[in-house]
A protein has these predicted regions:
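Post-Walker A alpha-helix
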Residues: 1-2
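Switch/coupling sub-region of P-loop NTPases
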Residues: 5-122
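A generic structural signal for short, solvent-exposed coil/turn residues
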Residues: 8, 29, 136, 187-188
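A broadly conserved detector of short glycine/acidic/proline-rich loop/turn motifs that flank catalytic sites
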Residues: 20-21, 41, 66, 133-135, ...
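Intrinsically disordered, low-complexity boundary segments flanking structured domains
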Residues: 22-27, 114-118, 127-132, 173-185, ...
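Amphipathic, soluble alpha/beta structural segments
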Residues: 66-79, 84-100, 137, 217-252
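Phosphate-binding/switch region of NTP-binding enzymes
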Residues: 119-152
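NTP-binding/hydrolysis catalytic cores, primarily Walker-type P-loop NTPases
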Residues: 142-253
């Protein structure tokens, strides 16, 4: 997490919230605009987060999501007041990460419904960078997993109006009822896939990044990095990527 700061543009202000000071980013990066806070006996972590929301921060960093209240802070900071949020967690798999964060939100009393809590979690998880340390003491990135929320589609129809018989109308009604109960009881909220994996000492691209995340990444890059990333995407995925500003310029022509 500390090393990732090098790759964040210096124009982006960093806002750090920890339960105990561990990152020491202001000492490592003395030229960066960094505000670090931790809770005390008289000032809660939630109060720290509320103050940080008003300090014009670009990146929120939550040191370690190890307790239920900290999970709530992470969700809040990822949804408002920053471009993106970084945090650490000890989940072994991506589904375990989603489940752990969802359960933390429920135990903290932020949500009462499992499905609603899980929807909020997957809406803020873009990438999971999973590090491992083997028995030789080597530490490396085992995988980078992308989370893709599944958008709910309206699949209900009014075909029953076209039916002439009561039996036909009931059949169409039961089709809609089946769709409703399937969405209510067993709807898939997200998909996940590894975009990069570590195999035999090398990193291998396994799946393309989703179009939405590619565009969001380009929108937050400077011109030089954006051009390099476009070449990378074209070379490895065969995708012609564009920023929102590219589309505006094209329409202006």
């Amino acid at each position: 997490l500390m090393a990732m700061i090098e790759n964040i543009y210096e124009t982006m202000n960093l806002r750090i919230t920890e339960t105990a000071f561990e990152l020491h980013l202001r000492k490592i990066y003395p030229t960066r605009n960094i505000l670090s806070m931790r809770e005390t006996e008289t000032i809660s972590g939630q109060a720290c987060l509320d103050v940080q929301k008003k300090t014009d921060g670009s990146v929120n960093i939550i040191g370690e999501v190890a307790t239920d209240p900290v999970a709530s802070w992470m969700i809040q900071s990822a949804q408002v007041a920053s471009k993106f949020t970084l945090f650490t967690h000890h989940a072994k798999t991506f589904p375990d990460l989603v489940t752990a964060l969802r359960n933390s939100m429920l135990r903290a009393g932020v949500f009462k419904d499992e499905r609603t809590a899980e929807e909020q979690v997957v809406s803020v998880l873009n990438f999971d960078i999973h590090l491992v340390k083997d028995f030789r003491g080597r530490r490396y990135i085992e995988r980078i997993t992308e989370c893709i929320p599944v958008e709910e589609r309206n699949e209900y129809t009014f075909d029953y109006r076209k039916e002439k018989t009561l039996e036909g109308k009931l059949d169409k009604f039961m089709d809609n009822a089946t769709n409703f109960f399937t969405k209510t009881t067993n709807r898939e909220l997200y998909k996940y896939r590894n975009v990069l994996e570590y195999h035999d000492g090398t990193y291998v691209l396994t799946n393309p990044i989703s179009d939405n995340n590619i565009r969001e990444m380009l929108n937050n890059m400077d011109d030089r990095d954006a051009e390099e990333f476009k070449k990378f995407v074209k070379r490895n995925y065969g995708i012609d990527a564009h920023r929102d500003s590219d589309d505006i310029e094209e329409e202006a022509k």
